[in-house]
Amino acid sequence: MLRRKFHSLKMLQTKLGLRGLLVYLWNRFARRIHLPAAVSTQGRTDIFKFYDFLNDKPFGATGALDAYAMRTINWVIPDVGIGSGGHLNIFRLIFLLEQRGYHCRVIITGHTHFNSGEEARDSIRKHFFPINAEVSIGESSLKAAAITVATSWITAYPVRNFQGTHHRCYFVQDYEPYFYAHGSDYCFAEATYRMGFHGITAGGWLAEKLSAEHGMQTVTMGFSLDHGLYRPLPRR
């Protein structure tokens, strides 16, 4: 339950920004104790603009890729928070792929607290893995690559729209519709599993669910243990 609530807050921060999240939390708190809301959102939220990323707006040049692009993988990710386990898995995969000769790019989409791709890259290298990947902000910075990977439901929409890639994959670590009550966000998250991406799932349960319920082609990445981080302590 706590893990689900924490993830929901992270998703809200991704969509609303830190200030928007604080306003949302304050207004909820104010309603509970019958205080006037500090900032009214009535009339301020442009729903169409808020969900504009859902629209089918193809971008990026199609056609043949050069030799460099054919060994390049784009990773489209939500904003990075220090200590995020989901991001840790993504950056570990990037780090290992680079050791095997692949070029990787990281594209942060949606709201981010970073001012530049360079700032984000420095933070990733300091707090996660020393990746060599170029890091950029915004889906407009996507460049041609053999493979483009979505890593959350809000990143799946720009990956669907990006035309400068030969293959689209979806690294799925959670069944994200379950983070919401049945409503718009639940449906928007669920719809991403029917976009025709090739799914790479954390564990077999997700692979079976996405295949059975959404017709998604999937492969499973088993759960592993980094013995450099997790190891039994000597008995006292």
Residue ranges and their predicted role:
Residues 2-72:
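Non-catalytic membrane-proximal stalk/linker segments that position and tether the catalytic domains
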Residues 49-64, 177-183, 219-236:
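Acidic anion/phosphate-binding donor-loop and adjacent secondary structure
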Residues 77-89:
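A short, glycine/small-residue-rich beta-strand->loop->alpha-helix junction that serves as a flexible
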Residues 88-97:
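Short amphipathic alpha-helix
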Residues 100-156:
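Active-site donor-binding segments of glycosyltransferases and PAPS-dependent sulfotransferases
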Residues 137-144, 182-200:
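Membrane-proximal helix-turn-helix segments that form the acceptor-binding/catalytic region
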Residues 149, 162-179, 200:
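Active-site proximal beta-strand in glycosyltransferases
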Residues 194-231:
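Donor nucleotide-sugar binding/catalytic pocket of nucleotide-sugar-dependent glycosyltransferases
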